[in-house]
Design a protein with these regions (language model features):
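Short, structured beta-strand segments at or near domain termini in extracellular proteins/domains
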Residues: 289-305
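Functional-site microenvironments in short loops/helix caps that host divalent-cation chemistry
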Residues: 13, 31, 40-43, 50, ...
Length: 311
């Protein structure tokens, strides 16, 4: 039902066939380049003198004020995942059946979405907030909610640990098997061995037990995008309160500025990448068949409790 608007209306259908309206395969949205705005606002401007002085003491005349459109970035993003990632990511491997079936066959309805770039994940959250939740809430006379978004790296790790601060894995303990010898996640146990854990590629999202927060697949199956930009030294300078390091890289920025943190490990990774503290990266404009995402909402606070049961 959520994708009904993607198809031609009945009046435009040919022989009553349900077909995708290709004009709607792109999603357009806008965001503000806060870093550029901050850099501009940080200059020591002397408007009375008709110029400004930078941090080096150099004086410049103001040629005219640029309007806010300079800081508003327009993004046009493909709606559908890259179906060819199953072939591109594994050369000399027979993954054509996954390419042909994974993104449309009902057998994969409960499998994680993959083949989505970091930019597409953000665009989905914008669409979900504006066109689904807030539009519906406004129609019901309810207040808006915070935007759906990708979790920060710190939020993801906190959720992954499930309250077990000293455990290397979301399920607790230092082992990746339970007492019966069964693997506790979908990953690559040994070289050339993808099936001992019960899955060859991805598996349904509820195939393994959740952590103590009730969250599934915080380790294995598919790795997950976070909102955090990747920097090897980020732990040396980020804050201890809701730490986050972000950088909105533009299309012409170098690749090193387009790195985004991924967490959790996937079906193709060894056990190290399933640990809650292991971090890796991928480029924001790159889609992979082993990377997905999950959306989060910032907590709004608790309303006044009526009785003890509401606490």
């Amino acid at each position: 039902e959520a994708l009904a608007e993607m198809y031609y209306q009945s009046s435009e259908q040919f022989y009553r066939r349900q077909e995708i309206d290709t004009r709607k395969l792109l999603f357009e949205y806008y965001w503000i380049d806060l870093q550029e705005a901050a850099r501009k606002a940080g200059r020591d401007q002397d408007l009375n003198a008709g110029g400004y002085t930078n941090s080096k003491g150099q004086n410049f005349s103001i040629m005219g004020h640029s309007d806010r459109s300079k800081f508003i970035i327009k993004e046009v993003i493909n709606v559908f995942p890259d179906t060819l990632t199953w072939v591109h990511d594994f050369t000399y491997a027979y993954n054509e059946p996954m390419t042909k079936n994974y993104f449309w066959h009902p057998a994969y309805d409960d499998y994680p979405v993959v083949g989505v770039t970091w930019q597409q994940a953000n665009a989905f959250n914008v669409w979900r907030t504006q066109n689904m939740m807030n539009a519906w809430l406004m129609g019901e006379g309810e207040p808006f909610i915070n935007d759906f978004r990708l979790p920060t790296e710190a939020e993801w790790e906190y959720a992954s640990r499930g309250g077990l601060d000293l455990s290397p894995y979301p399920w607790g303990g230092p082992y990746i098997r339970n007492r019966q010898g069964c693997f506790l996640g979908n990953f690559k146990p040994l070289h050339g061995n993808y099936t001992d854990d019960g899955g060859f590629h991805t598996v349904p999202i509820d195939s393994y037990s959740p952590n103590d927060y009730g969250l599934y697949n915080m380790a294995g199956n598919v790795a997950e995008w976070t909102s955090t930009a990747f920097d090897e030294s980020v732990y040396d300078f980020d804050h201890d309160m809701n730490p986050e390091y972000s950088y909105d890289a533009l299309a012409n920025d170098p690749p090193s500025l387009k790195r985004k943190v991924i967490r959790g490990g996937s079906f193709k990774d060894v056990g190290l990448y399933l640990q809650t503290g292991t971090r890796c990266f991928e480029y924001q404009d790159t889609a992979k068949c082993y990377i997905g995402f999950r959306s989060v909402l910032t907590y709004l606070g608790r309303g006044k409790a009526v009785n003890a049961e509401d606490l």
